[in-house]
Amino acid sequence: MAKHQFQTEIGQLLKLMTHSLYSNKEIFIRELISNASDALDKFNYLSLTDEKFKEENWSGKISIKLDKDDNSLTIGDNGIGMNEEDLMDNLGTIAKSGTKAFMENLTGDAKKDSNLIGQFGVGFYSVFMVAEKVDVISKKAGEEQAYMFSTDGTGEYEVKPVTKDEHGTVIYIKLKEDEKEFLDKWRVQEVVKKYSNHIAYPIILNYTEEETTGEGDEKETKTVQKSEQINEATALWTLPKSELKEEDYIEFYKTISHGDDEPLTYLHNKVEGANEFTTLFYIPKKAPMDLYRADYQPGVKLYVKRVFITDDDKELLPPYLRFVRGIIDSEDLPLNVSRELLQENRILANIKQNSVKKILGAIKKLDSEKMEIFTEQYNRVIKEGIYTDHTNKETLLGIVRYKSSSEEGMVSLDDYISRGDSEKKEIYYIVGADEKVLRNSPLLEAYKKANIEVLIMDDEEVDSIVAPMIGSYKEWTFKDITTIDAPDSKTEEEKEEISKEFKPLTDKIKEVLGDEVKEVKISTRLTESPSCVLKDASDPMAGMAAMFAQMGQEMPEIPLILEINPEHEMIKKLDKVEDESLFNDLSWILLDSAKLSEGLEPKDKGAFAHRVASLATKAL
């Protein structure tokens, strides 16, 4: 019987379970029942699709045994079971668990952290909040040999061959002396009702009870073995909506989400006709921890006629809806459908299309308070959807929210349109990395003066790719204010006249700045600042941000255009400066200060600081 060391991360996790995550100990029952249910789902599928595993009288069940004399609790199932390799992979190493991700996402708040346990697939280890020792006895379906995995949670485990008649898994938990509450029938029943009432398999509680018979001298007390089913064991989504209360939906959500939080909203639909299916979807109040991980765990399980098929198919919903939790149950898909066939299956494509419309419809109907929560958690992935889902782009544009130059908080595009110019039908926006910099940008001055609202898109990494490809929404065209002329009351002739008048000055500044700018020209957008910079919209690279992002490469620098404000006192005086050194310094200050206003850095910060100090000294 060889002893093995737990991998480092699991050793740390065991220590954490034992000493830190003690505020919500009862969840170990939830996690072990959830694992048992998954094992039953897997065997149920095999028994229906593979002749080798057909069993005439098989009926999936989970058993819990309370033994007060032994101070132990046992949870068993007759599911698919595990062999030696499975036990070591699933319980002894990090390979198949989310241990590392779990450790990375710990907050230090014991209650919050205990709710993360199930989300990262490390639920088995929660048993060490209450266990002194654990034995996992398992026999894999179709194999002769059973194995026992044993550990006291201190860093070592051992696996040895044992005898077991039926396939499935039994987890024997020797409880710590101060955890006797989990030997109380009512306490265990309360936990099962709270977290696992709608697990689709019966949960049988085995316990002993003192019974007294007779009276007087014939009075006799004896210990009686009892068994009773303590959950409803119904697939909740198969019940008619009229029979379900909100509490039922919330209770079931807690079962599938491995947490205590209530969902933001849920939607339960049954579709009949040529393609029959039922869906039950939930939108969590808080985004899953792996929302932005490439290896995220999908949150939707696929069933065919109540038989579990998979919980690991990223094709059931589009990637931007990966935060959705729930169930799809089809009446028409074949039971033995392969992963490859799932991707091409017309029935599933129809279910997916219908599901997306229903989910987006439910999001659009959220009240303002819930919409605020949704936006805070999921606005970024909705933008992802705008970029990738052309079919539902218009609906997604109705959901996304942006900051605004005119309003506090986030605004919808419909809000913007309701306040905009219905003749021009234009939606103005500016993109950058810093909200404060964008709000103070000289590029906004003309829009503020004309009382025109501009959307502040400060998630540059995403907005710089998504915004340019939106095109329009409800026939309103998107306009990037850095690439168009600003609102101005001057005629074209007047603008041309001013440009001619200041051409010697703009040429001279360009000569000083050289290749640092592509062009220096008179601005129609500035009302307060002396200068501003913008990227050259005509540059071939300007519209290629998305392509470079997809290739994982940095965007090449786009040449800058420096615009100067002919109405500003500094520009008027600069036109009359004869001192070449002073003119050069002021020209560079015009460029560098404009760059700073847009969150860009001067080419030579030291030289910029020196010029400012020098001019300040002369002014004193």
Curated annotation (Swiss-Prot):
Coiled coil, from the record: none
Residues spanning the signal sequence: none
Gene3D superfamilies documented for this protein: 3.30.230.80, 3.40.50.11260, Heat shock protein 90, C-terminal domain, Histidine kinase-like ATPase, C-terminal domain
Region (C) location: 547-620
Subcellular location: Cytoplasm
CDD domains, alphabetized: HATPase_Hsp90-like (cd16927)
Similarity-based family: Belongs to the heat shock protein 90 family.
Protein name: Chaperone protein HtpG
Gene, per the UniProt record: htpG
